[in-house]
């Protein structure tokens, strides 16, 4: 069993670990580079691009969590391109991930309605950005315990929580009422 299935059933081995999502990243990059030529209205283009940026940021964040700096490929690669891309520093990766998330935050709505419910919202992406900033401030990526990383994470998460709550999101008052 591979991926999450292997984890669920206790069958995960070193040979079955599959966390190298450059295929998905390549597909996202192709979509981002070619969407402008498509016959789609601007509002839909903006929405699709924002959602693709979130997915790319999420995929890169998963790799950075495991490996630190990874090669950041932001354009579709042709078959003739060099496969040995230089590894970016962790700080460069985090900055590019945050840039993708910031671009998505600017483009996404606070809430979706109708058939679009369940898509990424501004609140979701702000929460993800806050989480990534906390990871970047943590001992895993901040062994020198630089205070400015913690301050950045705190300031952003506080602002994000206030904006998210002001736009109708929040925590349930009672755990038992969730069910």
Where are these regions (language model features)?
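Short linear capping/connector segments at secondary-structure termini
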Residues: 74-81
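Short, flexible active-site-proximal loops enriched in glycine and acidic residues
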Residues: 67-73
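Helix N-cap and loop-to-helix transition residues
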Residues: 41, 78, 89-91, 121, ...
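Conserved, well-structured interaction surfaces
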Residues: 1-67, 82-95, 101-115
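An aromatic- and glycine-enriched ligand-binding surface/loop that stacks and positions planar moieties
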Residues: 1, 68, 94, 101-105, ...
């Amino acid at each position: 069993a591979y991926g999450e299935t292997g984890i669920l059933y206790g069958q995960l081995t070193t040979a079955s670990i599959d966390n190298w999502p450059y295929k998905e990243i390549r597909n996202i990059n192709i979509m981002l580079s070619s969407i402008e030529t498509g016959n789609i209205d601007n509002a839909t283009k903006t929405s699709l691009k924002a959602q693709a940026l979130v997915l790319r940021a999420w995929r890169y964040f998963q790799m950075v969590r495991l490996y630190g700096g990874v090669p950041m490929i932001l354009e579709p690669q042709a078959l003739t391109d060099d496969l040995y891309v230089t590894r970016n520093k962790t700080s460069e990766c985090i900055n590019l991930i945050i840039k993708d998330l910031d671009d998505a935050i600017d483009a996404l709505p606070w809430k979706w309605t109708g058939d679009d419910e369940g898509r990424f919202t501004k609140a979701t992406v702000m929460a993800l950005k806050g989480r990534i900033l906390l990871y970047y401030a943590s001992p895993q990526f901040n062994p020198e315990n630089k205070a400015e990383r913690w301050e950045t994470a705190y300031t952003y998460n506080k602002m994000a929580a206030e904006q998210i709550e002001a736009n109708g999101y929040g925590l349930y008052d009672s755990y038992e009422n969730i069910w």
